[in-house]
Amino acid sequence: MLVTIVASIACFIVGGILSYVLFKYGLKAKYDNVLKEAETEAEVIKKNKLLEVKEKFLNKKADLEKEVALRNQKIQQAENKLKQREMVLSQRQEEIQRKRAEADAVRENLEAQLGIVDKKKEELDKLQHQEIEKLEALSGLSADEAKERLVESLKEEAKTQAQSYINDIMDDAKLTASKEAKRIVIQSIQRVATETAIENSVTVFHIESDEIKGRIIGREGRNIRALEAATGVEIVVDDTPEAIVLSAFDPVRREIARLALHQLVTDGRIHPARIEEVVAKVRKQVEEEIIETGKRTTIDLGIHGLHPELIRIIGKMKYRSSYGQNLLQHARETANLCAVMASELGLNPKKAKRAGLLHDIGKVPDEEPELPHALLGMKLAEKFKEKPDICNAIGAHHDEIEMTSLLAPIVQVCDAISGARPGARREIVEAYIKRLNDLEQLAMSYPGVTKTYAIQAGRELRVIVGADKIDDKQTENLSGEIAKKIQDEMTYPGQVKITVIRETRAVSFAK
């Protein structure tokens, strides 16, 4: 048993040794094979890397050679350009030197010629001085006097020629514009017809008997005082039979007083408390009538979108007048004229009619009386959001501001047409006479005027001049100067025609 165990152990040991020897031998062979393969692969990789590096080197070398060649080419081109520029500069320098030499020669020649000219000028001055002395001796005039006479002669000749040119231009303008302007204005006037009103500051209230007059006066005049205090109207009770005079510059107040008196007389109860009650009631009625009149006017004219306060102002125009012409009728007439004229000129007739109706709203309000009515009307229109062109037409229709819209001259012309229409307006006698005298005196202030006559109610001024002081050409200048001075210094409705008359009479006697 023991022998068997020992033999087994010995066999195991011998087998292990043999196995170790065989394993070691096989591992070595495998190691050698792997090593050979690694060496072979390394050799291949080495060759490949060497080839790759060599290829990159060759490529970089080729690129560098190209870049060097390109740089050399650019350098060569730059050198060629530089050489060309040097050649051009050299040529220019030679040309400059040549021109400088020519300029020096020309300068020397000019200096020589200037010397000759100076000598000749001195000789001419001497000759001219001698000739002037001879002419002065022959004519008896100095050189300055002769110059003055020549200048005056040339001035007169220039004035005559200028006036002739002006006349030709004006005649041509009249021929081309007069027919069309007359057609538009005449057609506008013919298509508009309104009634005429008379300005007055008093209203006569008719009564049936003096008994009623006494009741109106009241005990110790208390009814009269109450009525005057309530209406702001002066009530004149005199010996005029069956009449009481209501005096006030405000037509609305007079109308309120008239209507209140009518109701009091009709009712029969006349005492201070009743007077105050009736006046308050009538004032409310008149205010309602004013608004109704404004609305009716805008509807008749086809004007919409007006501010209520502007409608009220238009209604109050019924009780206002200017130079005897009812303000509302004047505004309606101007509005219709503006619409017709705007249509003829290809403009918006509705806007023109609106501007024409509103152009005199500045005459109605009592505030800011120091402002001209055109500017006050423009402020009111701006306040109540009217369009800028309409506001400008209102403010510029008397030339207080510059006209910036096409509506402005239309409103100005139509306002003048309405005011200048025969029978449309009247003036106070004193103001009328004063205006005629001012017209005549203004024309008399010009030299050469001998007489002046204002005719046709001041719409024409005839100026008679001395034939020995003013010639035919100067008469036209004089008429223009007088017209301009009248425009600048005087206020008048419509237009004034200035006619200058120059008459020469030769009288001889046969014996």
From Swiss-Prot:
Provide the E.C. number(s) assigned to this enzyme: 3.1.-.-
Query: According to the UniProt record, what class of enzyme is this?
Result: hydrolase
Keyword line: Cell membrane, Endonuclease, Hydrolase, Membrane, Nuclease, RNA-binding, Transmembrane, Transmembrane helix
Q: Which InterPro entries match?
A: HD/PDEase_dom (IPR003607), HD_domain (IPR006674), HDIG_dom (IPR006675), KH_dom (IPR004087), KH_dom_type_1 (IPR004088), KH_dom_type_1_sf (IPR036612), Ribonuclease_Y (IPR017705), RNase_Y_N (IPR022711)
- Span of the secretion signal? none
* Residue ranges occupied by any HD domain in the UniProt entry: 327-420
> Where, if anywhere, are coiled coils annotated?
none
Which cellular compartments is it found in?
A: Cell membrane
Could you state one GO biological process linked to this protein?
mRNA catabolic process
Ranges annotated as spanning the membrane: 3-23
This entry carries the following GO cellular component terms, namely:
plasma membrane
SUPFAM superfamilies documented for this protein? Eukaryotic type KH-domain (KH-domain type I), HD-domain/PDEase-like
**Membrane topology per the record?**
Single-pass membrane protein
Job of this protein? Endoribonuclease that initiates mRNA decay.
Q: Which family does it belong to?
A: Belongs to the RNase Y family.
Protein name stated in the entry:
Ribonuclease Y
Q: Which organism is it from?
A: Bacteroides fragilis (strain ATCC 25285 / DSM 2151 / CCUG 4856 / JCM 11019 / LMG 10263 / NCTC 9343 / Onslow / VPI 2553 / EN-2)
Which gene is this protein's source? Answer: rny
